[in-house]
From Swiss-Prot:
Keywords: Chlorophyll catabolism, Chloroplast, Membrane, NAD, Oxidoreductase, Plastid, Thylakoid, Transit peptide
GO MF annotation, one: chlorophyll(ide) b reductase activity
Gene Ontology biological process terms in this record: chlorophyll catabolic process; PSII associated light-harvesting complex II catabolic process
Organism from which the protein derives: Arabidopsis thaliana (Mouse-ear cress)
Quaternary structure annotation from Swiss-Prot or TrEMBL: Interacts with NCY1 to form a complex that acts as a chlorophyll b reductase. Interacts with HCAR, RCCR and the LHCII complex. Part of a SGR1-CCE-LHCII complex, which acts in chlorophyll breakdown.
Knocked-out gene: effects: Slower degradation of chlorophyll b during dark incubation.
Miscellaneous comment: Chlorophyll b reductase activity detected in vitro with a recombinant protein produced in a heterologous system. Able to act on the substrate within the protein-chlorophyll LHCII complex.
Protein name per Swiss-Prot or TrEMBL: Chlorophyll(ide) b reductase NOL, chloroplastic
Length: 348
C-alpha cells in the first residue's frame, strides 16, 4: 500500500493509475474536504474518493454523485415510525390519528401521564397495537433521552420526529403584566424544549442507517410579525425558524446526507391554546376567518409529510397549511360576502 503526505492509499488499480492526480487534488490547501471529494469524483468519473487522515477509500459513486446533485436518497418504504411530542390533544393528537390511519406506527408523549394513558387507550381502540405512549417533559433533557430510549425499545428506530410540544401558559396580556412563572413556562417549553428534542432526535437519527426527518412546528410570530398580548410566545416561535435553519447549516457543514430538519406550519388551529386567546374583537375575527379544526389541518399535513421520505428527498422543506394566498382569499370572502362570521366564536 502506497502512502503520501501522511495519507494511506488503497491498492485499488484505479488509484494506482490516478495517484498523481489524487495527490495533486488533496494537496490543495484552499479546498474544503467536500470540494476535494467532488473534484476527485469528477476526475475519476466512476468512483467517489473519500480522504481521511487514516486511509483513502473508494466507494461506488454513480448513485452517490447523482444523489448529491438531486438531493435524494433511496426512498423510505412505509409504514413509517413516527414520534410526536405534545400529542395527547390538539394538532399533535390529530396528526397521530392521521399517521395511524395511513398505517404508520406512532409514539405519543405528554407531560401528563394520565393524558398519555387516555390517549393511547383511545387510539388503540381505533387502530390496534400501532401506538405507544410515555410521559415526557421536553424541558428536561433526561426525559427526552428516556423518550428516545423508549422509542428505540419499542420501534427500533424513528423515521419522522415532529416537535409539536408548545405553550403560551394560557396567558394573553401585555409583557409588562406577565408573571415570571408564565414567561419561564413559555420560553422553557418552546425554546429550550425544542432544542433538547432536536439534539436528541439528531443524535438518534445519525446512528440510524436510514437517517430520518425532523419537523419543527412554527406558530404565530414565526414570520416576524408582532404578537401583542403574547409577545413571549411570538418571540419563541420566531426562534423556531432560526433554529431550523441553523441546524440545516450544521448538518450541511458536517456533510450529513441522511438527516434533515424541516419546518411545519399548521396555521391557525382551533385548539384550546388558540381559543383561550379569543378575547378581543380582532382575535375573534381572525379565528373565525382563518382557523380550521385540527383534523382538517392534519388531513392536509400528513400526506405531505409522508411524501418526503417516500420520494427519497433529503432537501429541507417548509410545509404550510395556511399560505398567504389562502389567507387573503378567506379574508376577502369574509369582507365581501360575510363568510365564516361567528363560525367558532360570536363576534360583537
Amino acid at each position: 500500500m502506497a502512502t503520501w503526505s501522511g495519507f494511506n492509499v488503497s491498492s485499488s488499480p484505479l488509484l494506482r493509475l490516478r495517484s498523481s492526480s489524487v495527490s495533486n487534488v488533496t494537496k490543495l490547501p484552499f479546498l474544503s474536504p467536500i470540494c476535494r471529494r467532488r473534484l476527485l469524483a469528477e476526475r475519476f468519473g466512476l468512483a467517489t474518493v473519500v480522504v481521511t487522515r487514516q486511509n483513502l477509500t473508494v466507494t461506488p459513486s454513480s448513485a452517490a454523485v447523482e444523489a448529491r446533485i438531486s438531493g435524494k436518497r433511496e426512498p423510505m418504504t412505509p409504514p413509517y415510525n413516527i414520534l410526536i411530542t405534545g400529542s395527547t390533544k390538539g394538532i399533535g393528537y390529530a396528526l397521530a390519528r392521521e399517521f395511524l390511519k395511513a398505517g404508520d406506527n406512532v409514539v405519543i408523549c405528554s407531560r401528563s401521564a394520565e393524558r398519555v394513558e387516555t390517549a393511547v387507550q383511545s387510539l388503540k381502540e381505533e387502530f390496534g397495537e400501532h401506538v405507544w405512549g410515555t410521559k415526557c417533559d421536553v424541558t428536561e433533557g433526561k426525559d427526552v433521552r428516556e423518550l428516545v430510549a423508549y422509542s428505540q425499545k419499542n420501534l427500533k428506530y424513528i423515521d419522522i420526529w415532529i416537535n409539536n410540544a408548545g405553550s403560551n401558559a394560557y396567558s394573553f396580556k401585555p409583557l409588562a403584566e406577565a408573571s415570571d412563572e408564565d414567561l419561564i413556562e413559555v420560553v422553557k417549553t418552546n425554546t429550550l424544549g425544542l432544542m433538547l428534542c432536536c439534539r436528541e432526535a439528531m443524535n438518534m437519527m445519525l446512528t440510524q442507517s436510514r437517517g430520518g426527518h425532523i419537523f419543527n412546528i412554527d406558530g404565530a410570530g414565526s414570520d416576524g410579525r408582532p404578537t401583542p398580548r403574547f409577545a413571549a410566545y411570538g418571540a419563541t416561535k420566531r426562534s423556531v425558524v432560526h433554529l431550523t435553519k441553523s441546524l440545516q447549516a450544521e448538518l450541511q457543514m458536517q456533510d450529513v446526507k441522511n438527516v434533515v430538519v424541516h419546518n411545519l406550519s399548521p396555521g391557525m388551529v382551533t385548539t384550546d391554546l388558540l381559543m383561550s386567546g379569543a378575547t378581543t374583537k380582532q382575535a375573534k375575527f381572525f379565528i373565525n376567518v382563518l382557523a380550521e379544526p385540527a383534523e382538517v389541518v392534519a388531513e392536509y399535513l400528513v400526506p405531505n409529510i409522508r411524501a418526503i421520505p417516500a420520494s427519497g428527498s433529503m432537501k429541507p422543506t417548509y410545509i404550510r397549511f395556511l399560505t398567504g394566498i389562502k389567507a387573503y382569499t378567506k379574508i376577502f370572502s369574509r369582507v365581501a360576502l360575510g363568510a365564516r362570521k361567528n363560525r367558532y366564536v360570536t363576534e360583537e
